[in-house]
């Protein structure tokens, strides 16, 4: 956004990310992702020793938030947040009477967002930099320390991919990469420093786009509204001086929208009338193992996934940024715990950091205004909001979800229309099953093709969905609205021509399942992509 003792989920690690012990040899992806087909699967083993985490090295363990708990965002606070529309503010003199399309991208960025690592920097060191990079959530990777031009990046998606390789849940597409994956896991197990250079082939790389600081914001919004998550802003000689991210641009439009009538007039409009978002979503049942959610995000090229109960009601959100809680050996049992349990760990960790509980605010409904949606996105620093309807009152779905396994679907994709033929996959027992509609409507659950039978039982009981703050305030999942969707609409409503975001989404999915080239060329912008935006 997304109970165990907080010591089970420390933030960071002083060793090169958690390592399972006694791992069998890895084989290619034809033998399954999480299942134990032909000995290829390696579940996290017993960790005999515990090395201090990043957090333990940086600060003394804080007192437990259990002693005094209160919601950080009460209903009144949420209402106040949503009523604080910048449209009621006086225009900022810096942007008054200006066309937002003529604002220079350099006016929105700061040098503080730029964190550097070299290709020879260890994954451990890069992870520490990443944990400190908020709100940019990215580390720039350069060839050598004297360079000021990135050749790659390191973000939470890459950290997730690395952890999946280390614990044996990621599988290469060909025999050539089998040796690479095994070598990375071996070095991590032996606590040998692994340079970022070595993990480039396993990381899914987005196109690297750079703009000069004097480029107009219209160009930046066209690119970001086409599905690119960030743009590097450079000086005339090519040195990076800032990062223009989707979230930064949306925050700018939220704070300064009163100066731009084309943007400000859209805020009072309901999402239903704007026809924003998509009904094709990927969700996972709350009772499924966390390892399955992480694998699902990696395979599908996602930064977050909705967590739902048996009635398809949204009960939480897990993002790749949450893997920061898995960067120590002691946190490995969390991979075997349920998604619902991990959500409770996320909320507890936020309580430790802030001294109070967090109230999950990660959903909107079709009648929410754009202002309501953007307020939540900027306040929570989220990349998407789940669109929900009223909570499912179906007699077949208890008011307090029991979170028992669903025989027809463990994790899956919510599609916008019922397929003409039933989708076949495997249940938790490994036998074929047909996906069935969760209601009489058109939304169905398509089970994941990722088998989960080999994962051990959760190490602790799942926290009931009804026990979490806000559990009764969400509703049935029907869609999703992303930063890309909103920026794409802003661009089109202002006469710009962004590319179809679906192209970038498809590219991320392809690059997640295909063998990655071990070179920097895969991450450099293609001439064709730049021409389409020009």
Swiss-Prot record:
<dbReference type="Pfam" id="PF00571">
    <property type="entry name" value="CBS"/>
</dbReference>
<dbReference type="GO" id="GO:0005737">
    <property type="term" value="C:cytoplasm"/>
</dbReference>
<keyword id="KW-0539">Nucleus</keyword>
<feature type="compositionally biased region" description="Low complexity">
    <location>
        <begin position="512"/>
        <end position="524"/>
    </location>
</feature>
<dbReference type="GO" id="GO:0004865">
    <property type="term" value="F:protein serine/threonine phosphatase inhibitor activity"/>
</dbReference>
<dbReference type="InterPro" id="IPR050511">
    <property type="entry name" value="AMPK_gamma/SDS23_families"/>
</dbReference>
<feature type="domain" description="CBS 2">
    <location>
        <begin position="203"/>
        <end position="262"/>
    </location>
</feature>
<dbReference type="InterPro" id="IPR046342">
    <property type="entry name" value="CBS_dom_sf"/>
</dbReference>
<dbReference type="GO" id="GO:0042149">
    <property type="term" value="P:cellular response to glucose starvation"/>
</dbReference>
<dbReference type="InterPro" id="IPR016711">
    <property type="entry name" value="Ssd23"/>
</dbReference>
<feature type="compositionally biased region" description="Low complexity">
    <location>
        <begin position="406"/>
        <end position="438"/>
    </location>
</feature>
<feature type="domain" description="CBS 3">
    <location>
        <begin position="277"/>
        <end position="334"/>
    </location>
</feature>
<keyword id="KW-0963">Cytoplasm</keyword>
<dbReference type="GO" id="GO:0005634">
    <property type="term" value="C:nucleus"/>
</dbReference>
<dbReference type="GO" id="GO:0030071">
    <property type="term" value="P:regulation of mitotic metaphase/anaphase transition"/>
</dbReference>
<comment type="function">
    <text>Involved in DNA replication and cell separation.</text>
</comment>
<keyword id="KW-0129">CBS domain</keyword>
<feature type="region of interest" description="Disordered">
    <location>
        <begin position="389"/>
        <end position="438"/>
    </location>
</feature>
<feature type="region of interest" description="Disordered">
    <location>
        <begin position="1"/>
        <end position="71"/>
    </location>
</feature>
<protein>
    <recommendedName>
        <fullName>Protein SDS23</fullName>
    </recommendedName>
</protein>
<feature type="region of interest" description="Disordered">
    <location>
        <begin position="494"/>
        <end position="534"/>
    </location>
</feature>
<dbReference type="InterPro" id="IPR000644">
    <property type="entry name" value="CBS_dom"/>
</dbReference>
<feature type="domain" description="CBS 1">
    <location>
        <begin position="109"/>
        <end position="173"/>
    </location>
</feature>
<comment type="similarity">
    <text>Belongs to the SDS23 family.</text>
</comment>
<keyword id="KW-0677">Repeat</keyword>
């Amino acid at each position: 956004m997304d109970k165990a003792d907080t010591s089970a989920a420390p933030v960071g690690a002083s060793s090169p990310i958690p390592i399972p012990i006694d791992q069998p040899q890895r084989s290619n992806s034809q033998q399954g992702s999480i299942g134990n087909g032909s000995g290829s699967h390696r579940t996290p083993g017993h960790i005999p020793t515990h090395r201090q985490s990043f957090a333990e090295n940086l600060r003394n363990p804080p007192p437990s938030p259990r002693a005094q708990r209160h919601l950080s965002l009460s209903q009144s606070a949420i209402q106040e947040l949503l009523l604080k529309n910048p449209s009621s503010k006086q225009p900022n003199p810096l942007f008054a009477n200006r066309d937002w399309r003529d604002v220079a991208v350099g006016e929105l960025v700061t040098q503080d967002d730029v964190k550097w690592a070299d290709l020879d920097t260890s994954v451990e060191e890069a992870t520490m930099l990443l944990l400190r990079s908020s709100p940019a959530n990215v580390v720039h990777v350069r060839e050598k320390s004297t360079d000021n031009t990135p050749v790659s990046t390191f973000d939470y998606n890459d950290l997730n991919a690395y952890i999946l390789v280390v614990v044996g849940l990621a599988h290469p597409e060909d025999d050539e990469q089998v040796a690479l994956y095994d070598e990375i896991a071996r070095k991590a197990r032996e606590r040998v420093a692994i340079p970022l250079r070595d993990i480039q082939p396993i990381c899914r790389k987005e196109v690297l786009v750079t703009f000069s600081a004097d480029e107009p914001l219209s160009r930046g919004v066209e690119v970001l509204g086409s599905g690119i998550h960030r743009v590097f802003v450079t000086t005339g000689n090519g040195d990076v001086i800032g990062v223009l991210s989707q979230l930064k641009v949306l925050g700018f439009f939220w704070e300064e929208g009163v100066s731009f009538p084309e943007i400000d007039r859209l805020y009072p409009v309901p999402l239903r009338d704007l026809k924003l978002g998509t009904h094709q979503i990927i969700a996972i049942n709350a009772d499924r193992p966390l390892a399955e959610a992480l694998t699902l995000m990696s395979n599908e090229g996602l930064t977050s996934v909705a967590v739902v109960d048996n009635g398809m009601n949204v009960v939480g959100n897990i993002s790749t940024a949450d893997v920061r809680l898995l960067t120590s050996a002691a946190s490995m049992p969390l991979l075997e715990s349920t998604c619902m349990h991990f959500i409770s760990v996320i909320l507890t960790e936020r309580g430790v950091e802030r001294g109070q509980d967090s109230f999950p605010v990660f959903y909107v409904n079709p009648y929410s205004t754009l202002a309501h949606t953007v307020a939540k996105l900027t306040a929570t620093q989220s990349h998407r909001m789940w669109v929900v309807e009223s909570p499912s009152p179906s007699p077949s779905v208890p008011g307090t979800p029991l979170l028992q396994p669903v025989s027809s679907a463990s994790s899956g994709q919510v599609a916008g229309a019922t397929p003409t033929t039933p989708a076949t996959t495997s249940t938790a027992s490994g036998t074929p099953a047909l996906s069935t509609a969760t209601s009489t409507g058109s939304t169905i659950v398509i089970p994941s093709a990722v088998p989960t039978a080999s994962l051990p039982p959760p190490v602790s009981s799942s926290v009931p969905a009804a026990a979490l703050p806000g559990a009764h305030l969400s509703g049935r999942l029907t869609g999703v609205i992303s930063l890309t969707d909103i920026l794409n609409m802003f661009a089109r409503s202002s006469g710009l021509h962004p590319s179809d975001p679906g192209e970038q989404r498809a590219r991320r999915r392809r690059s997640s399942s295909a063998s990655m080239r071990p070179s920097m060329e895969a991450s450099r912008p293609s001439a064709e992509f730049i021409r389409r935006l020009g």
